[in-house]
Amino acid sequence: SWIFDDRPDSLKKFYGWTGMYGLPRSLWAGADGTLRMRPVKELETLRRKEQVKSNFIVKEGWEFKLNGFGHELLELEITVQLGKATGAGVMVDCSDDQREQTSIAYDASEKQLIFDAGKSSLDLGRRNIESAPFELKKDENLILRVFVDKGIVEVFANDRQAIGRCVYPRLGGTGVKLFAKGGDIRVLSVKAWELTASNPY
């Protein structure tokens, strides 16, 4: 996939590029004939320092902070049981003062995966909301895989949808928070890994 550089045109000319490749993906046809996608398995070799938190409730309207889970190079795997809730999501790159954060959510009523960059950066980039069609099946858990590479954030939802953006945080925040909408959610598991560099130099 291609991730566009959302900085002003003058900066694109100065730095000499207008975007970058996203993570390599495996693509295949599902049993229903629709496209499936996930990050290639080889990326798992970059994982370091696994952390796990399992089986807890996030109340509607809460922002549940995952202390110690954040890092500037990060992979998250989040499995959520929605129950009667209408949405659930995660915020990454959260600054301590909450002025910067990038929000990723599933909206069951709108049947969308939503990437909200409205508070991603105090400085650069498009402060807008990007969405993609996505719907959970009956009784299906929400599985989000989120990758943070400093200013690049990519999310994969249940192997069926993905969004990637440059977000340009300026405050150095690495906080991670979960949230629920329209009801409480049960988080079956959150796994987090710090990621090492893919190049040895």
Label the model's feature ranges.
Residues S1-Y201:
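Beta-rich accessory regions
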